[in-house]
Structure formats: structure tokens, C-alpha cells
A protein has these predicted regions:
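Structural motif corresponding to the C-terminal cap of alpha-helices
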Residues: 309-318, 349, 443, 574, ...
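Short, gly/Ser/Thr-rich active-site loops of penicillin-recognizing serine hydrolases
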Residues: 539, 649-669
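Membrane-proximal periplasmic segments of bacterial cell-envelope enzymes
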Residues: 1-261, 265-286, 329-330, 336, ...
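Beta-lactam-recognizing serine transpeptidase/beta-lactamase-like catalytic domain environment
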Residues: 66-69, 74, 273-289, 298, ...
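Short, basic/aromatic recognition patches
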Residues: 39-51, 302-324
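A short acidic/glycine-rich loop-to-helix N-cap element
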Residues: 636-651
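Short conserved micro-motifs at the rims of enzyme active sites and ligand-binding pockets
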Residues: 239-241, 600-604, 631, 640-644
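Solvent-exposed, polar/charged alpha-helical surfaces in well-ordered, non-transmembrane soluble domains
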Residues: 90-94, 98, 197, 201, ...
Length: 669
């Protein structure tokens, strides 16, 4: 027994010692090492969270004129709380209209009916028959069908009981439930100071209502070039997954089109970051930072001049005969040897009760192709030289070509005997037809069948593609089309191809073509982004982050003497040929005019079936050491199916006036 008692005492002693040790450790944790363990707990429970979207980068033109800035917008928003019911949201809406001024006239009848439905479920249910409910069980009707039936059976008399206050609450309820349930709902932007302050100070007891400062874009030159600058907005539903993968939140504002979209990664701001600690406090670890600023190659004042000239000349042309289908013109001005776009404009005019009104359609310079006509004869001539179908200075007779069962194919006017330079100057179709037949290894005889080697199409298209025709120019914008590339390889179509009457090209493709000629065969990527600057907290530009260097896509595969000969031909166009005075006071210009048969969708039925005549012009100046290239295209300048022979020179006038204006602004010393 004494042994057992001794053991018990020993065990008791050990237990007491253990309790003392445990107690001492608790004292150390609670008093001596308290801060240490709090830090450990915080590190295990802290979460990094981001603040609201930061402002986007600013956009400038090449002369550092500010084009796009940010404007702070005070916003009231609603975030649905967990387990809130429709009835509770209705009550919340009635409460909040006391503090938020909303325009209930924007409320649609459908929205008001949905509000009535939430408040009168029993009555609405009674308006659905047993037979209709049975159809749901039989899967002849869906629950959505039943909801629509309920809505349809709400009468104007039901709604007439609603007061102005009820309608305000109904409109707020609609805003609270628009879109996905998990999304923040913008209730009001540009909130008043009183509204913003009240909700900011009381957000903890307003059931999901809160405030924030967001940013909207401010365009300092109005609509000038705005369509290319692009839009910003909420993430499109179809791109939700892609943006989430890139660490965006669904409430973020992103670039949706053109420059804003193309350079989203540069322009987007960096959100502030906070550590959310275990005690629900926030500690800022990095501040919000505006996105990088970008400088474009565009000269905004030149752009304004171009827009105004096109508008004026299009409206003038509509007073001329036979311009029924004329309603748009495109212009692109580039800088040779770099590819920079100095101005790019598309203008569309429509008639209204007060006359004509113009619209900006500049994005269509990348997607609206047309048959360019004779402007491509420089590339066609090069095919002839490269394949040895002709020699420099070769003389032939301008005479109509006749293929069996086909109409005669002639030049617009016969010149008689002519060489390659005169052929370009006078825009001889026949000269090109004869080259095409030689390239196609044809044995031509008047009014007999024409057989060609179809590989001739590939030979032509390869050379054309080296100028940017029939391929993407790789301009730094999200959308660009190739134009139409004909699949039929009939012999007469090869002849048509050689004079720009088969495949179609966009204005930007034609601009790359003439810029390649002006740059001695160097095909450059056309671009709008010129420089990127780090953001600052002032109105001044920050540190230069990087500058865009010209990108050479390829060189035209030809001999220097051949390209030089084409350039001489383009110079002759402007001195002795059909292009005299088309570039006005531009010094020593070179270029090429073009007229084509083209087809348009005149009645907007989706079918391109109305024959018209279109005009194009491409040029550059000065001939030696060019500083600019210009491309002007005007579809539908003439209706050929009338008894009126008048043809408007609107395309030439636009080219002349813009070229003159350019060199007035930027004279050559």
C-alpha cells in the first residue's frame, strides 16, 4: 500500500509540474510573446485584395496634343447580399429612392409589370389555369413560358395604381436586378455630392448599396478620329473566361475596339493592392497607378482637315448629275520609309430633312474593299518585267482585244503606238492585256478562243502580295480584311486582273501598295502606335518607355531598274498623263489614277448586285525623297446604266485639295 501511495504522489507531482509548464507557456503566449503570435496568425489568414480600377493611360497625337484623357465619375452601385429575397429588395428600393434621385421615365412597361409581379405573386398565380400548369408537367410549357403568361395578363388597370414614388422604386428595383446576380449593378453614375456622401457614410446599413469613383474617357477633339481611338466598357460576356484567365475582374472596364482594344495591356491601369488581415483591417501595399500613356502617329489637325475636305466635296458631288450611289470616300496618308499613318479617314454622307449629314466610317478603311482599277498597273507592269514578258521601253499598239464570245476589251481611249511609260501615263488597258497574255503563255488571235496557263494568276498574285495587295497589311488594329480573291481562273479574268478589275482591295491595302513603291520596294507595316510613356501624376508626359521602330515586312522581288521604271511611269502620269494636277500644289508628285466597274448593295438587301463606277487614286510626293503617300477611294461615283454621261471628279478634287493642304501645312524647304 505504501508503494502505491508513493506512486500516486509521484504522479500528482508530475501532473502539477506539467500544469505549471503549460500555464507558463500560456502566460508567455498571452503576455510576453503576444505580438509574435498575432503576426503568425495574421500571416496565415491575410489575403491580398485589389482596389477599384485605376485610370487608363492617356492618348496623344504625334505632336503631343492630348486626344483622350480620363474624367472621374462618382458612381452609386448595388451588390446583392447573400440570401436576400425579392420582397426585401423591394423594401430596400423604396428606402433608397429617398436618397437617390432617379429618372423613372426610363422605366419600361415590361419592367413595371415585373415589379407588379414580385409584389402580387398570389394574384399572378391565380391568373394561370390548371390546364396551363398541367402543360408544364407534360413539358408542353416551360416555367419561363408561365412567367411570360403572367406578365402578359397584367393589365394597364393593374399598373394604374402605381404612383410616381412606386415607379421610382420599380425603376430602382429593375436596376438592382439587371444582368447577372453576382455582378455589381451601376445604379447611378455622375451622382450628386449629396447622394455620394450619404451613401458613402452609411453604406454599412444600406443593404448592398455603396459608392466608388470610376473613370470615363474624355475626347478632347470630339468625334475626330474617335472611331479608331476606340471604345471602353464592361467585359463582353463571350470574352468573360478569357479575361478572368488574365486576372481581370468582371466589373473591370476594358478596351472594346480599335486602339483601346489593341493596346489594352499598355493602357490599362494598375489597381491598388491591400493586405486584408485576420482582424478585417486593410493595409495598403501598393498604390493605384494610371496606365501607360501612348503617342500615336496621327496628326490630329491634319486629320481634321482631311475629314472636312471629304465632307465638303462629297456634299458638293451630290448636287452633280449621276451621283445616285455616291455616299462615301476613304483617305489614307502615310509616311514613306517608316509606315506611320499620318491621317486615316472614312466619311459617309446621308440625306435628311435638312440636307446632308456626315458620319465617321474610318474603321472601314480596313474592311471595305473595292475593285481599284488602273492604280494597280504599277504592280502589273512589274510582273511583265520580272517574267520577261516585256522589256523596258518596249513599244506596242493600243488596239482592242477580242476573245471569242466575249465583248471587246479596249483602253478608255486609244493612244496608238506607245511604250511602257506612256502606257502608265495614259493608263492603257491593252498594254496590260498583252503582258497578261504573254505571262499566261497564250497564243492570241483576234476573236478566237483564248487559252492561258492558269499559273499566271499565281505569278500575278505573288507580286501583288509583295506590295500588300491581297494579303493583310498587319496594321496594329484588331480587325482587317483581305478583300475578295477570285477563284475563277477564266482567261478573260486574267486580263481583268491585270487592270484591277477582278480582285478587290481595301484602302489600307492600296495605301501599303503605294507606300511600297515610294519606298523603293520596301513593304513596311503600317502603324499607329509611335511611342509609349510611363504614367505621371501631372499633366506632363513621363519617361519614355519605348519607341516603335519601323518594321520591314518584305522587299519586292524585282530588279532596281524595273521598280525605277514603274516610278518613272507614275511620275509621267502626273506630268503628261491622266493624273495632271490631281495632287494640286504638291511638289513633283508621282501617282496613278484608277477607274473600275464595281458592284454595291444599293437597296441594303444583303446582295451586292448594283453596277456602278468607282474611282481610286494613289500617289506620293516629292518624286525624289517622298515625305508622304496618299490614297483616295470613292466607290459608286457614277451610275453607268443611265442616259447621263456625266462622271463626277469628286475623287480627284479630294486628292488635289488634301495634297495641297498637306504641303501648305508641311512645306518642303
Amino acid at each position: 500500500m505504501k508503494q502505491i501511495s508513493g506512486r500516486i504522489y509521484i504522479i500528482k507531482f508530475i501532473i502539477i509540474i506539467l500544469f505549471i509548464i503549460i500555464f507558463w507557456n500560456l502566460v508567455k503566449i498571452m503576455y510576453f510573446n503576444n505580438n509574435y503570435y498575432i503576426k503568425i496568425l495574421d500571416s496565415l489568414t491575410e489575403v491580398i485584395v485589389e482596389g477599384e480600377s485605376a485610370p487608363r493611360g492617356r492618348i496623344y497625337d504625334r505632336n503631343y496634343n492630348l486626344l483622350v484623357d480620363n474624367e472621374a465619375v462618382p458612381v452609386i452601385y448595388y451588390q446583392k447580399t447573400k440570401n436576400i429575397t425579392n420582397k426585401q429588395e423591394v423594401e430596400l428600393a423604396y428606402k433608397m429612392i429617398e436618397y437617390i434621385d432617379l429618372d423613372e421615365t426610363k422605366l419600361l412597361t415590361r419592367n413595371l409589370k415585373e415589379f407588379w409581379l414580385v409584389n402580387n405573386q398570389s394574384e399572378a398565380n391565380s391568373r394561370i389555369s390548371k390546364e396551363e400548369y398541367q402543360k408544364v408537367k407534360k413539358r408542353e410549357l416551360t416555367l419561363n413560358d408561365i412567367e411570360n403568361l403572367k406578365i402578359s395578363r397584367i393589365t394597364l388597370e393593374d399598373l394604374s395604381k402605381y404612383t410616381e414614388k412606386d415607379k421610382k422604386a420599380a425603376y430602382l428595383y429593375y436596376l438592382m436586378n439587371k444582368g447577372y446576380s453576382y455582378e455589381e449593378k451601376i445604379i447611378k453614375d455622375n451622382a450628386s455630392d449629396e447622394e455620394f456622401l450619404y451613401i458613402s457614410e452609411n453604406n454599412d446599413r444600406l443593404g448592398g448599396f455603396d459608392t466608388k469613383i470610376t473613370w470615363k474617357r474624355k475626347y478632347l477633339y470630339g468625334d475626330t478620329f474617335k472611331s479608331i481611338l476606340g471604345n471602353v466598357g464592361s467585359i463582353p460576356k463571350e470574352l468573360k473566361t478569357e479575361y478572368l484567365k488574365n486576372n481581370y475582374e468582371l466589373t473591370d472596364i476594358v478596351g472594346l475596339s480599335n486602339i483601346e482594344k489593341e493596346y489594352e495591356s499598355i493602357l490599362k491601369g494598375t489597381k491598388a493592392k491591400y493586405i486584408k488581415k485576420g482582424n478585417n483591417t486593410l493595409e495598403k501595399i501598393s498604390s493605384a497607378k494610371r496606365g501607360n500613356d501612348i503617342v500615336l502617329s496621327i496628326d490630329i489637325n491634319l486629320q481634321k482637315e482631311v475629314d472636312n475636305i471629304i465632307d465638303t466635296q462629297l456634299i458638293r458631288a451630290k448636287s452633280e448629275a449621276n451621283t445616285k450611289y455616291l455616299n462615301k470616300t476613304y483617305v489614307v496618308i502615310q509616311k514613306p520609309n517608316t509606315g506611320e499613318i499620318l491621317a486615316m479617314s472614312g466619311r459617309n454622307i446621308l440625306k435628311n430633312a435638312d440636307g446632308y449629314i456626315s458620319y465617321d466610317i474610318t474603321p472601314y478603311t480596313l474592311t471595305d474593299p473595292m475593285a481599284p482599277g488602273s492604280v494597280v498597273k504599277g504592280a502589273s507592269m512589274l510582273v511583265g518585267y520580272n517574267t520577261k514578258a516585256i522589256q523596258i521601253g518596249e513599244v506596242t499598239t493600243d488596239e482592242c482585244i477580242k476573245i471569242k464570245n466575249k465583248p471587246k476589251k479596249c483602253s478608255s481611249h486609244q493612244v496608238g503606238r506607245l511604250n511602257d511609260i506612256v502606257a502608265l501615263a495614259e493608263s492603257s488597258n491593252v498594254y496590260q492585256f498583252k503582258i497578261a497574255m504573254k505571262v499566261g503563255k497564250a497564243n492570241y488571235k483576234y476573236n478566237e478562243d483564248l487559252v492561258i496557263d492558269e499559273k499566271a494568276f499565281d505569278i500575278y498574285r505573288k507580286t501583288f502580295s509583295e506590295f500588300g495587295l491581297g494579303v493583310k497589311t498587319q496594321i496594329d488594329l484588331p480587325v482587317e480584311s483581305l478583300g475578295y480573291i477570285g477563284k475563277n481562273r477564266a482567261p478573260d479574268l486574267l486580263l481583268n486582273y491585270s487592270i484591277g478589275q477582278y480582285d478587290t482591295y481595301t484602302p489600307i491595302q492600296l495605301s501599303q501598295y503605294i507606300t511600297t513603291i515610294a519606298s523603293n520596294g520596301k513593304r513596311l507595316k503600317p502603324y499607329l502606335l509611335k511611342e509609349v510613356y510611363e504614367p505621371t501624376k501631372t499633366v506632363e508626359l513621363g519617361k519614355l518607355a519605348y519607341k516603335i521602330e519601323p518594321i520591314i515586312l518584305n522587299y519586292v522581288d524585282t530588279e532596281d531598274q524595273y521598280l525605277k521604271r514603274v516610278q518613272e511611269g507614275f511620275r509621267a502620269v502626273m506630268t503628261i498623263g491622266l493624273g495632271k494636277n490631281v495632287m494640286g500644289n504638291a511638289p513633283n508628285p508621282a501617282g496613278k489614277t484608277g477607274t473600275s466597274e464595281s458592284f454595291i448593295d444599293a437597296d441594303n438587301d444583303g446582295k451586292i448586285d448594283t453596277e456602278t463606277v468607282s474611282n481610286a487614286f494613289v500617289g506620293y510626293a516629292p518624286y525624289e525623297n517622298p515625305v508622304m503617300t496618299i490614297t483616295v477611294t470613292s466607290p459608286g461615283v457614277e451610275d453607268p446604266n443611265t442616259n447621263i454621261s456625266f462622271h463626277s471628279y469628286v475623287n480627284r478634287r479630294i486628292a488635289r485639295e488634301i495634297s495641297t493642304k498637306y504641303f501648305e501645312k508641311f512645306p518642303i524647304n
